[in-house]
Amino acid sequence: MEEYQVYLELDISRQQHFLYPLIFREYIYGLAYGHYFNGSIFSENVDYDNKSSLLIVKRLITRMSQQNHLIISANDSKKNQFWGYNKNLYSQIISEGFAIVVEIPLSLQLNSSSEEAEIIKYYKNLRSIHSIFPFFEDKLTYLNYVSDARIPYPIHLEILVQVFRYWAKDAPLFHLLRLFLYEYWNWNNLITPKKLISTFSKSHLRVFLFLYNFYVCEYESIFLFLRNKSSHLRLTSFSLLFERIYFYGKIEHFVEVFVKDFSSTLSFFKEPFIHYVRYQGKSILASKNASLLMNKWKNYLIRLWQYHFDVWSQPRTIQLNQFSERSFHLLGYFSNVRLNLSAIRSQMLENAFLIKIVMKKLETIVPIIPLIRSLAKAKFCNVLGHPISKPLWADSSDFDIIDRFLRICRNLSHYYNGSSKKKSLYRVKYIFRLSCIKTLARKHKSTVRAFLKRLGSEKLLEEFFTEEEEILSLVFQRASSTLQGLYRGRIWYLDIIFSNDLVNHE
């Protein structure tokens, strides 16, 4: 009965757009507690029951409610200090509770109409990792120019909070959220982007991710709207993106002049459409048009960040390159387009001649050095790539230890299965296998050689050596016509069922 009452209370709060009372409900932090300690494949199964208590969380929330959070000054973080116990642990749990509550108005607005439901369906497809990989494989080889850029972080947290203010109709919730963030980070001065990125990467607060996604969503809503409008310009007389930076001005006279005097120039801008891909904080712009058009989009992005979001970005941070000249880093891969030269001998009557054909081929390579650095940070190996044991896992059973290593190894294998060269992937598998063996040997207080000799490595770790094709996975066959007939290849990215945590350490 209590469970139904909880859902009824949540539904009433959604309908009334008044979420402030939910902040002080204990069950919210019960949900947050479970989410926080089960959110990553690299999480340690430590007994947190001795370190935390929902009663303490409730006291902290009650103490927050007794403060004057409707008025915030620069010195509030010194006067209103309510952290007493395990600061990192309880701040994480409270932030998870805040994230659960502040996500409610977003889900309410997105489900309020069929039109908005279509919008969120479009954006889900746009941001799906299963749609990015096929885009790279199918489209990238036909494009000429790529511009990769990291979306700049706001210089101050207040920018993120104000973006959320546009959506939230609950003023007390907005002020309490701001108070919590000021208390947690002790924001007396402006935070530099370097410090903000460092804080974000270390804490991984869900509420910060939520606010940052709001910030990125607003940026993309403006940029993609203009991009979609520009793609339709070629269907009318407004086919010019030439010298256009401010998109809201009237350009009838502009088009008339250029069509009359520079008609020969318009052939370069018949298709101003560009492709946009974004994963986490990095975005890629790609086009098959001239570099001049891509430079115009680059300048527009910089002005959009500077004037609309008050975020400073240097023009050199967005680099424009040809695919054949430079590789780029996205989704944990190093990717580039390589030109393959081939010669075909053709004979016509008595004359024979050679035809040279240039074909583009997409190459995706696993960046082994950043990956080993991430594995070293997760304590699977040292900085040189030599496998080490996991002492925190040595207290588990043999089956649990093998299952943990096997699960992580399979997730990474599925994620990097699209690599053109498998040598780096084999090295990663070797690190996990030997790290697993060393952990088991540490548990049984034996050397690796003696442990393998006593138990037998083949039977104990046979699942590690199982071929990927024999593992039950979501694999379909894709047919493509080639010169040799019908080729059946694996759609490898459908195997990805878990986000790659190591991509966050790029």
Curated annotation (Swiss-Prot):
A Pfam family that the UniProt record links to this protein: MatK_N
Predominant location: plastid
InterPro entries: Domain_X (IPR024937), Maturase_MatK (IPR002866), Maturase_MatK_N (IPR024942)
Residues making up the signal peptide according to the UniProt record: none
Any Gene Ontology CC annotation: chloroplast
Location within or outside the cell: Plastid, Chloroplast
Entry keywords, A to Z: Chloroplast, mRNA processing, Plastid, RNA-binding, tRNA processing
Organism superkingdom: Eukaryota
GO molecular function: RNA binding
Record-level GO BP terms: mRNA processing; RNA splicing; tRNA processing
HAMAP family xrefs: MatK (MF_01390)
Family: Belongs to the intron maturase 2 family. MatK subfamily.
Primary role: Usually encoded in the trnK tRNA gene intron. Probably assists in splicing its own and other chloroplast group II introns.
Protein name (database record): Maturase K
Organism: Spartium junceum
Lineage: Eukaryota, Viridiplantae, Streptophyta, Embryophyta, Tracheophyta
